[in-house]
From Swiss-Prot:
This is Sodium, potassium, lithium and rubidium/H(+) antiporter. It is found in: Cell membrane. It comes from Bacillus velezensis (strain DSM 23117 / BGSC 10A6 / LMG 26770 / FZB42) (Bacillus amyloliquefaciens subsp. plantarum). One of its GO terms (cellular component) is plasma membrane. Keywords: Cell membrane, Ion transport, Lithium, Membrane, Potassium, Potassium transport, Sodium, Sodium transport, Transmembrane, Transmembrane helix, Transport. GO terms for molecular function: phosphatidylinositol binding; potassium:proton antiporter activity; sodium:proton antiporter activity; ubiquitin binding. The chain crosses the membrane at residues 5-27, 46-66, 83-103, 110-130, 156-176, 182-202, 228-248, 276-296, 314-334, 355-375, 389-409. GO terms for biological process: regulation of intracellular pH; sodium ion import across plasma membrane.
Length: 671
């Protein structure tokens, strides 16, 4: 029961972290998850559990790296093989040597072998954290692929170096020749075992298909089990399980098209299932990381043998050492003409890109999990020297690199003046995708009962799709902000005209309330970019219709009410046109004329639609329900585009405002 409660709390924290990210999108989700994990573990009765290193690697790291190996473009990795090896192998060993001597010089109480071990476990970068952070900023494609390739390889090299350093610290014996031979054997064996085991699994799946066993559920289960089987088998024979799952992922990617091209349903189910699994695993990694930090920190802060400010200073010095070494390594080795030829296909970063690569070296879960595997005692039975301090330093460096990357990466990558045209193209493409998502949602929920209303809404969205390109040119001389301001002025003029009609007694109270409610919704949508423009009254009416059915009224009463509302709206629209003409200046002329054109179109539509159709309240409620589903589909699509890095954070905000514009237009047409 305790394990179940811990898992339930962890999953709840993941859900909360994504909700929080919607309100503070400038903070990456991993950092929020780490913070929530820290908070959950800070209370005496909070989230406390011992991190099992072996279980952590097989349960989390194996499937995550398998998926990364499967999804990372192989051709781009091959083109970047030299710089990837430079970072994943060369920089790791340089970090072990330079970092080890620096740590031992700064903290003599940590033996040199243990210092090498700490430097080794600090050398791997966290590919999960890098992917999450890069989703918030626009990184050059070459740098992103380089960081992904580095993250796939350096976990293994760092852990192998860590293993030998800790073994030397425990036993007091070390052989460089033996360590080098073992490293080659473990690495090559891991890659080879991953390829062989993956090939056998693929052949097994083909064999099942030849037997006619093409059940999607069974094949999906084999896919899910694959990374665990590869990792455990590789570790059992004494080679690198991490490199094995990476090689296994790449092997599966090579065979994927041939194996699954005829199983379209499996591809769809596989994509959806893995997205859910990866979402949960990524979140759990960072929440668990945060949950371990309070216990690690409290041990050092409560120990009178340590000066708290001094140990924090150690963390800062180690972090800066890692960053500077990474910067110099990339700068000198990349710009060395003796190393790279002038092949333009090889990405060669400048100073800015070098800084990006340096700051993107975020440490994460592998570092903390590896440090927890340090034994408590040496071979002679004495306590491992400064084990608690080593854990504290590892946790501190993880937090420093994560926070530093969060702050610095947007500064280094945000160059809006260089991407204006690209942004316009992306926004136009994204808007088309949003409308397509809405149309898909409408068609999926269409049935015999709501078919007429569905076709009506589909027609509206098709019209929007056709007008997108026209809108791109008509709004080029005005900003959306100015347009919303003028539209808000028009709504205000309509409200004033409505008050005059009420004072003269030209319209009944129920009609006035209905129109005032609509004007309030439109005003909110044009002035508040983050508020949903659905009133409580309308929502209540919709829910009543969904659960209890429509409120019966005589057909003639309904027609009279609809006709009166339309006639009144024509009057308020004409009043808005007159008001906008009076306030039109040279500065806002283009915007004002566009809004006046909108009102003229509205008047024309209101005057004709009443004679062409006799809408019932049921029909209108059906349309409202369909539109709400479509709007939600659009919001989901925006989040998907953001998570898949097709749009930036700023573009997602702009598109969410675009949703409000669409919703306002729908409410205007919902007469």
């Amino acid at each position: 029961m305790d394990i179940f409660l811990v898992v339930l709390v962890l999953l709840t924290i993941i859900a909360i972290s994504n909700i929080v990210n919607r309100f503070v999108p400038f903070i990456p989700v991993p950092l929020i998850q780490v913070a929530l994990g820290i908070i959950a573990a800070s209370f005496p009765q909070g989230l406390h559990f011992e991190l099992n290193t072996e279980l952590f690697f097989v349960l989390f790291i194996a499937p995550l790296l398998f998926n990364d190996g499967k999804r990372t473009p192989r051709a781009e990795l091959w083109n970047l093989r030299a710089p990837i090896l430079l970072l994943a192998l060369g920089l790791v060993f340089a970090t072990v040597i330079v970092g080890g001597y620096t740590i031992h010089w700064m903290i003599p109480s940590i033996p040199l072998a243990a210092a090498f071990g700490l430097a080794a476990i600090l050398s791997p970068t966290d590919v999960v954290a890098v992917s999450a952070l890069s989703g918030r900023v626009k990184m050059p494609k070459g740098i992103l692929r380089l960081l992904e390739g580095e993250g796939l390889m350096n976990d293994a090299s760092g852990l192998v170096a860590f293993k030998f350093a800790i073994a030397a610290a425990v036993t007091g014996a070390f052989s460089l020749a033996q360590a080098a031979f073992s490293f080659v054997l473990i690495s090559a064996g891991g890659l080879l075992s991953g390829v062989v085991i993956s090939f056998l699994i693929i052949r097994f799946r083909l064999f099942l298909r030849r037997l006619g066993m093409q059940d999607v559920t069974m094949h999906m289960l084999i896919q899910i089990l694959t990374p665990f089987v590869i990792y455990l088998a590789a570790e059992e024979i004494g080679v690198s399980g991490i490199l094995a799952v990476v090689a296994g992922g790449i092997t599966h990617a090579v065979e994927q098209d041939r194996l699954e091209s005829t199983m379209v349903k499996l591809q769809i189910v596989s994509s959806s299932t893995w997205n859910i699994i990866l979402f949960i695993l990524n979140g759990l990694v960072f929440v668990i990381l945060g949950a371990q930090i309070p216990d690690v920190v409290s041990v050092i802060f409560n120990d009178t043998a340590f000066n708290n400010m001094m140990v924090i200073g150690y963390i800062i010095v180690i972090t800066l050492t890692l960053m500077i070494l990474r910067f110099l390594w990339v700068l000198f080795f990349w710009n060395g003409k003796w190393f790279f030829n002038k092949d333009q296909s090889i990405y060669k970063p400048g100073l800015r890109s070098t800084l990006l690569i340096s700051v993107s070296g975020v440490r994460g879960a592998v570092t903390l999990a590896g440090s927890f595997s340090i034994p408590y005692v040496l071979s002679d039975g004495s306590p491992f020297p400064e084990r608690n301090l080593i854990l504290f330093l590892a946790a501190g460096v993880i937090m420093c690199t994560l926070v530093l990357a969060t702050i610095v990466l947007p500064i280094l990558t945000d160059k809006p003046e260089d991407n204006v045209k690209e942004k316009k193209v992306k926004l136009l493409t994204a808007r088309r995708k949003l409308i397509k998502a809405a149309l898909t949602a409408i068609k999926e929920n269409m049935n015999e009962t709501n078919k007429t209303a569905s076709f009506a809404v589909i027609a509206e969205y098709n019209e929007k799709m056709k007008n997108l390109r026209f809108q791109q040119f008509t709004v080029k001389n005005r900003t959306k902000k100015d347009e919303r301001k003028v539209r808000a002025q028009g709504i205000q003029a309509e409200q004033e005209e409505l008050l005059r009609l009420i004072e003269r007694g030209d319209i009944p109270e129920e009609t006035a309330d209905s129109l005032q409610e609509r004007f309030d919704e439109l005003e909110v949508l044009y002035t508040n970019p983050f508020k949903v423009g659905l009133s409580k009254k309308k929502l209540k009416r919709l829910m009543y219709w969904i659960f209890f059915g429509e409120q019966k009224k005589p057909e003639m009463t309904i027609l009279n009410e609809e006709g009166l509302i339309r006639a009144t709206r024509v009057k308020t629209a004409k009043a808005a046109i007159e008001s906008l003409k009076k306030h039109m200046t040279e500065e806002n002329k283009d915007v004002t004329l566009a809004v006046i054109s909108f009102y003229n179109h509205l008047i024309f539509r209101l005057g004709h639609s009443y004679h062409e159709q006799n809408p019932s309240r049921r029909f209108e409620n059906q349309k409202l329900e369909i539109k709400l589903r479509a709007v939600q589909a659009i919001r989901n699509e925006i989040q998907t585009l953001f998570e898949e890095r097709e749009i930036s954070r700023d573009m997602s905000h702009e598109l969410r405002q675009y949703i409000n514009d669409v919703e306002a237009a729908m409410l205007d047409g919902d007469e």
